[in-house]
């Protein structure tokens, strides 16, 4: 289903935990990371499509999340010809998306990447809100920046620690790169184990599959 300009209606999902970290999924058998997203079927509202895609890609149900915001209008990106099937070239241009910001009220173990027979992700982690755009496929980066920036107004500020010195806070706007230099410990879900966590170590976000250190 395309609009007159050749864009397919679509929804994107930014899923937050209680610490304002976002669900960050590694695409199946690829080295790129992204948010859950998917097309709106004929007769669906954007909200209905969002809940369907949420379950298909993360295993979560409506009772596991709370909607706290959405973009005011469609955000568009064009797909390069090399990623478009030959039979639809000249008609299909890309995606137009409504983005939803969700707060997870369930538990991490409610997330299951094998909720369907065709999973989108083979690993996931919680990442800082301002995700590293260099881990995202290039033609989606501008839309990610627009969606994150527009929806950031809905974020609640985490409580300030009493012993933390007050002072100017660094800007949280792009450009910003997270976790590309220093070694860090990531928590992902291996889809071979339903709703269980393993601790892994990687020197960069795109070093996948990571080396397993110890099971939790």
Curated annotation (Swiss-Prot):
PANTHER family referenced in this protein's UniProt entry, alphabetically: ADP-RIBOSE PYROPHOSPHATASE (PTHR43736), DIHYDRONEOPTERIN TRIPHOSPHATE DIPHOSPHATASE (PTHR43736:SF1)
Record key words, sorted: Hydrolase
Pfam family, one: NUDIX
InterPro entries the record matches: Nudix_hydrolase, NUDIX_hydrolase-like_dom_sf, NUDIX_hydrolase_CS, NUDIX_hydrolase_dom, RppH
Residue intervals of the Nudix hydrolase domain: 6-149
HAMAP family in the cross-refs: Nudix_RppH
Superkingdom to which the source organism belongs: Bacteria
Biological function: Accelerates the degradation of transcripts by removing pyrophosphate from the 5'-end of triphosphorylated RNA, leading to a more labile monophosphorylated state that can stimulate subsequent ribonuclease cleavage.
Essential cofactor(s): a divalent metal cation
Name the record gives this protein: RNA pyrophosphohydrolase
Gene this protein is translated from: rppH
PROSITE patterns for this protein: NUDIX (PS51462), NUDIX_BOX (PS00893)
Keyword tRNA processing: no
Taxonomic lineage of the native organism: Bacteria, Pseudomonadati, Pseudomonadota, Betaproteobacteria, Burkholderiales
């Amino acid at each position: 289903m395309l609009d007159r300009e050749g864009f397919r209606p679509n929804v994107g999902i930014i899923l937050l935990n209680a610490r304002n970290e976002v669900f960050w999924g590694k695409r199946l058998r690829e080295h790129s990371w992204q948010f859950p997203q998917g097309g709106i079927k004929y007769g669906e509202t954007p909200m209905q499509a969002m809940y369907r895609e949420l379950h298909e890609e993360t295993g979560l149900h409506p009772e596991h999340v709370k909607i706290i915001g959405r973009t005011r209008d469609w955000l568009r990106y064009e797909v390069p010809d090399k990623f478009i099937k030959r039979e639809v070239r000249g008609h299909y241009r890309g995606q137009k998306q409504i983005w939803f910001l969700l707060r997870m009220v369930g538990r991490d173990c409610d997330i299951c990447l094998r909720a369907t027979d065709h999973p989108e992700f083979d690993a996931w982690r919680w990442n800082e809100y301002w995700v590293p755009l260099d881990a995202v496929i290039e033609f989606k980066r501008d839309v990610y920046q627009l969606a994150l920036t527009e929806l950031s107004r809905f974020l609640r500020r985490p409580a300030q620690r009493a012993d933390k010195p007050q002072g100017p806070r660094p800007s949280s706007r792009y450009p910003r790169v997270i976790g590309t230099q220093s070694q860090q410990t990531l928590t992902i879900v291996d889809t071979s184990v339903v709703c269980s966590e393993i601790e892994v170590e990687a020197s960069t976000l795109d070093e996948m599959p990571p080396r397993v250190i110890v099971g939790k």
